[in-house]
Amino acid sequence: ETCEALLDFVKRGDHLILGHGNGPQVGNVMLQHEAGMKVFELPSMPMDFCVSETQGSIGYLIELGFKKVLAKSGINRNVVTLITEVVVDKDDPMFKNPTKPVGPYYSEHDAEEYSKQTGAIFREDPRGRGWRKVVPSPQPIKINNIEIVKSLSEQGNIVVTVGGGGIPVIEKDGYFTGVEAVIDKDLASSLTAIQ
């Protein structure tokens, strides 16, 4: 339905660059990793890895949906998904006060146990639904592959980028490394439009 709603923009010749959320999906990925850790002793993956997984899977679904809508309308346009890193400041104050809830709800006991095992920080849900892991939600500074986004868009491609707000990375020793955080999808999409 969303792809159909955007079809008029495509027909008008607009260049579409799409961002998307991943809230429920990244929570599901975290549960999959947790189950793998408990049942098979597989390593649990960090938040940046989980965001990259959801960028790929949700982007794939958006591509399928858009290609179907385009084909029905007789429009020949490519749809491409980019795994996108978004730079954040390592000194962002949100790293000292994580507040963004992610993943499932836990009992207080289970949250304490999980915290002991992993070092994760939990906060009680204000509505009394349980305890949830919280992570920092720093401000996005730069879209790392913005030049590729621009180039693909200018060539007429529909570009899916900054999924889930982008993979949060910081610059360290001249290269980028992922961090345990989530970026607001609306802020990342706005930054994409500005850059």
Residues covered by each model-derived region:
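Short, basic, glycine/proline-bearing loop/turn elements
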Residues: 1, 128-136, 170-179
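Ligand-binding beta-strand-loop-alpha-helix segment within the catalytic cores
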Residues: 36-159
